[in-house]
Regions:
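Long, low-complexity, charged/polar intrinsically disordered regions in eukaryotic proteins
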Residues: 1-35
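Short, well-structured alpha-helical interface segments that form or flank functional binding sites
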Residues: 7-10, 14, 65-69, 75
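Amphipathic alpha-helical interaction surfaces
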Residues: 21, 25, 56-57, 76-80
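Short, surface-exposed, charged/polar-biased interaction segments
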Residues: 32, 36-37, 91, 95
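Short helix-coil junctions and helix-kink-helix linkers
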Residues: 37-65
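A short, conserved structural fragment
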Residues: 71, 75-88
Length: 100
């Protein structure tokens, strides 16, 4: 059970890493209408990044889209602002994460 729980939380690391790679902000994307690598489900969007880096999906595969729930959790935790269409790291979290 411990291994499963650790893997569940890893999805947040995947999202936060994408946000840092993109200067603190990334599109949420859309996995309900597109397959991985197409339309709004590319690797630079949160849904595409989760599909590839967390779920191990390959280009052209169908994906699930848990972004609305995960975005709300990151907002509640004070890690990222859950905005319409994108997530953005909070200034406070960036400062703590960068060790300043």
């Amino acid at each position: 059970l411990e291994v499963v729980i650790r893997n569940i939380y890893r999805v947040f690391d995947v999202i936060v890493s994408l946000l840092f790679r993109n200067g603190g902000k990334a599109r949420k994307g859309n996995g309900r209408n597109y397959k991985l690598g197409y339309g709004d489900c590319t690797e630079d969007a949160i849904v595409g990044c989760i599909a590839k880096e967390y779920a191990g999906k390959k280009e052209g595969m169908s994906v699930f889209d848990p972004v609305f729930v995960l975005s709300a959790i990151l907002d509640w935790a004070g890690i990222a602002h859950n905005e319409r269409g994108y997530l953005e790291l909070t200034a406070e979290y960036r400062t703590r994460a960068e060790g300043r």
